[in-house]
Amino acid sequence: MSTFRFHALTIAIAAATWALPPLAFATESPDAAATDAQTPIRALDTIQVQGSLLGRSRPDDVQRYAGSRQVIDREQLRNGGNRSLDDALQRVPGIKIFDETGTGALPQLMLRGLYESRSGRVQVLEDGIPLALAPYGQTSLSLFPVGLNQIDRIDIVRGGAAVQYGPNNVGGVINLVSKEIPSEWSTTLAHKVTAGGQGQFLQDSALSSGGYLTDNLGLQVDANRTYGEYWRAHSDTDISNLRVRAEWWLDDTKLLKASVQRYLVDMDLAGALSPDDYRRDPRQSTRPLDSFNGRTTRASLSYEQLFGDWGPLKDVRLSWTNFSARSSRNFIVGMRQAATETWRSDLPPQLRQTAPRDFRVVGSEPRLSWSMGDAGGVRQQWTAGVRAVHEDIDFLVGNLRLRDGLFTSVRDWQFEDRALAAYVSNAITLPDERLTITPGLRYERLDSRYFNRATGLRTRNQTRDVLPGLTVGFQANAEWFFYADGQRSLRAPQVTQIIFGNNLDAELAWNYEAGTRYQPNDRTRIQLGAYLIDFDQQIQLDNTTRVFRNLGKTRHQGGELELQWSPENLRALTLNAGYAYLDASQESGAFRGLRVPYTSRNQIILGGNYTLGHTTVALSSYYFSKAYSDAANTVQENAIASVGELPSYWVWNTQVSHTLFERDGQKFSASLAINNLFDRQYWFRGVDTSPWGRQAAPSRTVTAGLEYTF
């Protein structure tokens, strides 16, 4: 059946791509185009709309996007009681976060029921560049060098983006969009203090300063430092982040962008607790050796140019992005020697394990967009690109026996990934400009090599996949927009899997979506959608042979609803609500038909904000129903708390923001936020280096902040 679907969709895409006459195409609605025409200074500005599937993440981009999509804007980030990006993402239907610290430093993201430790099954980008340690071989976010002061908005695309943004995009794409460099120099100083109770305070200082030094050269510096303790014992935290960006307009049609970033993190990890210890005091820590540290230096250089017309090719535009990252991270944990006691938190550690990994990543992605001719009123907009990524990974694990100081090297591995991807899509708009059909194809080629320095063993793994996609958008009238899409997505075999595998295929999924957006006026927005993710060839470990194989299958299906409304007679009040239903089931193995671990069937989001003069009051909440922590869907928690039902929880947050004064380009504001307002106690399980026990979720915290812009 999957083979038939693949060929049918491929043939349909090929027919739609080549059969129609070549035409020019505009991706924006007339209203959006008129708005943009008032603000751009340079001809190249529109490259962000026509050359990129996601555009600029403006309201019209979202309204006319042929897939499920939501944008969290700057005001929501600033006034929504968000300690970190984690807090903001909790309010998006379909996203669940296992927050262990409240700092956002080690995000644990689940998108539409797809989850792996340290967000391994979520594609997160910053300005279109992957944030993963290694986009193919190590997709986790163990290092997350992004602060709230850097980001203007978050663009969450849950469908329809697989052709242009891959790999690891089965559940969708989260793009963190940086603040634009202002035309006039501006500086913002901010400081927040979060009180976690029992004398524990977490400080966060931030600086953002930038502007155009000349008519053609802009510079932006963003820096922040987070230090202190989060709300639990054994939680010392020290995070430093510095990012410098530059824009150089060579002329009105040529733009050069550069970015350099340095990120440092050192954290103690409180870890999970045994059930008895959790009941006694969820704030305590019984894992005194657990900690984490990491370093990364990231850089990017991009060039954008509007060439104009080349014969039959009209409005030709080039975007060429190059990026590199050199990273290291190390998790240090206490362990027991017996396999039946490895991760027990209620017993003193016998081993001190270190797991340093080094990553060197280089990537380059040129992308062209153009329109072609005009015949019969049909319009086309083409986008084609190629991306090459090289990854080199050093993987070490060592154990220090505490009783006698004996050190044992457990793993000494080296990996190389050489990836090449190519994609093409064609957005075809019919004469009345109401129906747009976008077929596309993506080709992924990955060569992975593994070398065991200790034994001399070498292993190779190759994957070759063609990934079709097709999206359809229909503007029924000024109020209603309908969409549907189908696409093939993949996640490459991870470096630790190819060691014990035998020429593994990539994990593949068919994604289907259909939905609608309704916007009768500027005060009301409704989005409703349904989806199906048919995930096959998931890589699983055969416990008998200890070999990884493409055995696993899961099916994720559900619906998502988002509402936003402001009363006609009280426009200062904005109310929002959301609901997500998820039916994620295992489709293979001994537990076929049971729920996928960690997935909640129901998610509810409620919130609102009210602005009166210079004061804004915001209230938000999220609810997740119960979940299971193992494939067998075990209800009763066992003695070591490695399995058992996870509780439902409803968490409320609030923030009051007030502008103290604003004049002559200066603004001074203050805020007070309470997270987990009613101090709801709940826990997670299976979090990375402390998988047994109850991982306590953040309790109530109070955050006071000051911000000065001049």
Segments and roles (model prediction):
Residues 369-373, 431, 437, 530-534, ...:
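Gram-negative outer-membrane beta-barrel transporters
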Residues 302-306, 311-336, 394, 475, ...:
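Membrane-embedded beta-barrel scaffold of Gram-negative outer-membrane proteins
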Residues 161, 178-210, 223, 230-232, ...:
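Short strand-turn segments of transmembrane beta-barrel domains in outer membranes
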